[in-house]
Amino acid sequence: MKINIGNLVFCPRLITTIFAVIFFLLFIYLGFWQLDRAEQKREFQSFYNERHQEEIINLNNNLISNTSDFLWRRVSATGIFLEEQQILLDNQVNAGQAGYYVYTPFKIKNSPDIFLINRGWVPVGKDRNKSPKLIFTEGEVTIEGVFKKEPRTGVLLMENKAEKLEDGVTRFQKIAISEISDKTKINLFPYVIRLLPESKHGYIRNWKLRNSGENVHIGYAYQWFAFATTLFIIYFVLNIKRQGYV
């Protein structure tokens, strides 16, 4: 293919053109995909903020028939911690220090529901084979937290095996409620409650309002569009020649 442009000739090779078109379209696709991800994050941020500002729901007085109505809402509950079972979520970092999130089953008063409560962060300690120092709360208490799905975990480098550190203290690589229910023989509700910082009976809780991260995706989108533009310029420059040099 030859296209005359004044005293210049644009004459790209077929194989070069094919590769250029493929990667150009790929970069454009990835750019728009990142913009779509940014929009999703923006929508979630708006949803989260709205839910977080709504009135606290008392789980003792409200039947959980539709979990989507409770998701990311602040909730309160009166009941007892089942302290004989402590779940440690491994590989959690706070201020650059390795540690665990401590989850404890919580039986809601006058209800069959038992929730895993994320009570916050504790350091691992000097010996990973020993349980960290834990607090034990006896008797009936009232807690406040955020109603949410079990936390997502990235790619695991090892299987999610249950590691017993001592009687009643088990370490997991991820929170999979069905697996924890099987291990503890407790019929757990398939959602968790993350204890609010102002609520008692917890550990270190540096929870932060979720950042939507939309600006990160927008930045990535600009990068992909920049790659597409750069590819187009390189393709054009490398395939244009003066008349008589073709």
Residue spans of the language-model regions?
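Phosphate-centric recognition/catalysis
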Residues: 65
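Surface-exposed, charge/polar-rich loops and edge strands
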Residues: 1-62, 73-246
